[in-house]
A protein has these predicted regions:
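RNA pseudouridine synthases
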Residues: 1-234
Length: 234
């Protein structure tokens, strides 16, 4: 187990950690996932092994394998119950940083489109009328890269999903016509040289502390691989 956890916030009840890219949240079914976030959490805090479902070790929510960023860990059963309720009631605010192909015509917008399982490709999600309600807000932070004729090749976005459907941000941005850079599963034309994964990072989370009732805000800076790629484009 070579990966280690970067702890962004910690007290007796809850912790916020930085999920590295390439690591899945926890084992799913009988598939071997290698080292998971649940493994790393159990190694760092052995006492949380009994918090929440057995395979999650206190992990309150998940990020896609190749998405990096902040995730919450409940260190007690009381905290796990309270935090999962906040997610279910959409009281947790999450902000992502995404680099997308091209530049959206509307600099600040909202995508309201149902998301469900792809009929032909079961491991992927898609927008379709039989899906579950999903809503994502975005705002252009800057445009970078050269697409020729004075146009920008990419747009850097702040993204706020108000619902938490599987692959929601990736699906919604692809449906907008601006897939996440490097996300070939959802429409990116190709993975650019220097970008080893999809450019999507969970940059910030705000939640109410399950015991004190105070609002907690935790930020996770852009990791080195994405920061280096962005620097090359600027």
């Amino acid at each position: 187990m070579t990966e280690t956890l970067t702890v962004l916030y910690e007290d007796d009840d809850v912790a916020a950690v930085s999920k590295p890219p390439g690591v899945v949240a926890h084992p799913v079914g009988s598939k071997s996932a290698g080292v998971t976030m649940a493994d790393l959490i159990a190694k760092r805090w052995p006492a949380v092994a009994g918090v929440g479902p057995a395979e999650r070790h206190g992990l309150v929510h998940r990020l896609d394998k190749d998405t990096s960023g902040v995730v919450l860990v409940a260190k007690t059963a009381r905290a796990f119950e309270a935090l999962t309720a906040q997610f279910a009631e959409r009281q947790v605010e999450k902000r992502y940083t995404a680099l997308v192909e091209g530049v959206p015509a509307v600099p600040r917008g909202r995508i309201d489109a149902p998301v469900g399982r792809h009929y032909a490709k079961g491991e992927r999600m898609t927008v379709h009328p039989d899906g579950r309600h999903a809503e994502t807000k975005y705002e252009i932070v800057e445009t970078v890269g050269d697409a020729g004729r004075g146009g920008a090749a990419y747009a850097l976005l702040d993204v706020w999903p108000s619902t938490g459907r599987t692959h929601q941000i990736r699906v919604h941005l692809a449906a907008l016509g601006h897939p996440v850079a490097g996300d070939t599963a959802y429409g990116a034309t190709e993975r650019p040289v220097g970008l080893g994964r999809q450019f999507l990072h969970a940059a910030e989370i705000k939640f109410v502390h399950p015991v004190t009732g105070k609002q907690i805000r935790v930020k996770d800076p852009l990791p080195a691989d994405l920061a280096a790629f962005l620097k090359e484009l600027r």
